[in-house]
């Protein structure tokens, strides 16, 4: 536990120290910044804000974790577990980096196409499964203490889990500080689970990422001086999925990650309902003012028809939802 605290503090300090230099380099080179959605007018002033800040906190967390684990890992099983989680973080970070690079440096608005991104994500998921999950012999999901055997279909579950949550966190990263602190809340919860299970190597990895993310948040809270970009959000979502698998608590991510589930569900519902009503009535109708859900809250509160919410209000509400959901999971696991 002490080692985890030291690693978290080091990650925080290095991340917070290096981020201003990243931002300054970005501005001096006059690199194109984040593009804003025109439908949310209060965001237009953020156009040009440096992005790809996830590159910094991912490098910091990975480097500190590897350095500390070199002196703390005592068996090959722990080494395989940590290397598996780190590998999926790095792979998805590279995918996000490519996407950001094409948008910013090559001025390709779409970045990677949806098919290209999905293909790379699936390839990364397959590497994670065959190199780190399959050798462990895991082929079942732990649901409330019961083992649901999936056999070969566990492969498809892993792909769905990793790809799904990487994209879900990516959708959540839409306003200042929302994704970074939401992920911190999720990681703290998994840190508690790892501690109770005695998975101290996983706990150390979680601690380094929490520290690096908090260092990043010093510059990502409203008004944000930097955004994490796809390089950060895709990697963080994949990391959460991998940790839930490593701790054999896959189901918990549906509740711990309720914010990401809500954001993704809002997009899916909106698109499906719009297509259905357009086919039935000749014009598309919407359930939400705008998706993902955080934009709906910005434009009119919970009902979508009330007063506009500030970004801080949206953040506080969704962080609160995530915190309560995480406490519920811990209560289910260790109290009831």
UniProtKB/Swiss-Prot annotation:
CDD domains registered for this protein in UniProt: GT_MraY
EC number: 2.7.8.13
Catalytic activity: UDP-N-acetyl-alpha-D-muramoyl-L-alanyl-gamma-D-glutamyl-L-lysyl-D-alanyl-D-alanine + di-trans,octa-cis-undecaprenyl phosphate = Mur2Ac(oyl-L-Ala-gamma-D-Glu-L-Lys-D-Ala-D-Ala)-di-trans,octa-cis-undecaprenyl diphosphate + UMP
Main location: membrane
Family annotation (InterPro entries): Glycosyl_transferase_4, PNAcMuramoyl-5peptid_Trfase, PNAcMuramoyl-5peptid_Trfase_CS
Pfam families: Glycos_transf_4 (PF00953), MraY_sig1 (PF10555)
Top enzyme category: transferase
Keywords: Cell cycle, Cell division, Cell membrane, Cell shape, Cell wall biogenesis/degradation, Magnesium, Membrane, Metal-binding, Peptidoglycan synthesis, Transferase, Transmembrane, Transmembrane helix
Transmembrane segments: 3-23, 53-73, 78-98, 118-138, 143-163, 174-194, 200-220, 226-246, 251-271, 316-336
Membrane topology designation: Multi-pass membrane protein
GO molecular function, one term: metal ion binding
GO cellular-component term (any): plasma membrane
Recorded metabolic or biological pathway in which this protein acts: Cell wall biogenesis; peptidoglycan biosynthesis
UniProt-listed GO biological process terms: cell division; cell wall organization; peptidoglycan biosynthetic process; regulation of cell shape
Key word Magnesium present: yes
HAMAP family assigned to the protein according to its UniProt record, in alphabetical order: MraY
Known function: Catalyzes the initial step of the lipid cycle reactions in the biosynthesis of the cell wall peptidoglycan: transfers peptidoglycan precursor phospho-MurNAc-pentapeptide from UDP-MurNAc-pentapeptide onto the lipid carrier undecaprenyl phosphate, yielding undecaprenyl-pyrophosphoryl-MurNAc-pentapeptide, known as lipid I.
Family membership noted in the UniProt record: Belongs to the glycosyltransferase 4 family. MraY subfamily.
Name under which the protein is recorded: Phospho-N-acetylmuramoyl-pentapeptide-transferase
Record gene name: mraY
């Amino acid at each position: 536990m002490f080692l985890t605290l030291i690693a978290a503090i080091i990650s925080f300090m290095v991340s917070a120290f290096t981020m201003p230099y990243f931002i300054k380099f970005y501005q001096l080179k006059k690199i194109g910044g984040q593009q804003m959605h025109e439908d949310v007018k209060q965001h237009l002033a953020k156009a040009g804000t440096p992005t790809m800040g996830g590159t910094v906190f991912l490098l910091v967390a990975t480097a500190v974790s590897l350095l500390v684990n070199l002196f703390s890992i005592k068996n090959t099983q722990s080494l395989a577990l940590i290397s598996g989680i780190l590998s999926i973080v790095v792979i998805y970070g590279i995918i996000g980096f490519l996407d950001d690079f094409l948008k910013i440096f090559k001025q390709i608005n779409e970045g990677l196409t949806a098919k290209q991104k999905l293909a790379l994500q699936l390839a990364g998921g397959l590497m994670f499964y065959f190199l780190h999950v399959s050798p462990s012999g895991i082929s079942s999901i732990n649901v409330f203490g019961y083992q649901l055997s999936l056999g070969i279909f566990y492969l498809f579950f892993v792909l769905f889990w990793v790809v799904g949550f990487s994209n879900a966190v990516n959708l959540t990263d839409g306003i200042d500080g929302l994704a970074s602190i939401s992920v911190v809340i999720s990681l703290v919860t998994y840190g508690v689970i790892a501690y109770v299970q005695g998975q101290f190597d996983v706990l150390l990895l979680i601690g380094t990422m929490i520290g690096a993310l908090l260092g990043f948040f010093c510059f990502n809270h409203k008004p944000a001086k930097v955004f994490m970009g796809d390089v950060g959000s895709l990697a963080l979502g994949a990391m959460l999925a991998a940790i839930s698998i490593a701790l054999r608590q896959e189901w918990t991510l549906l509740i711990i990650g309720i914010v990401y589930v809500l954001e993704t569900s809002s997009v899916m519902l909106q698109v499906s309902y719009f297509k259905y009503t357009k086919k039935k009535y000749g014009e598309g109708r919407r359930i939400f003012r705008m998706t993902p859900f955080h934009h709906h809250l910005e434009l009119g509160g919970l009902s979508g028809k009330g007063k506009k919410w500030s970004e801080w209000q949206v953040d506080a509400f969704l962080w609160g939802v995530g915190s309560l959901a995480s406490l519920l999971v811990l209560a289910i696991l260790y109290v009831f």
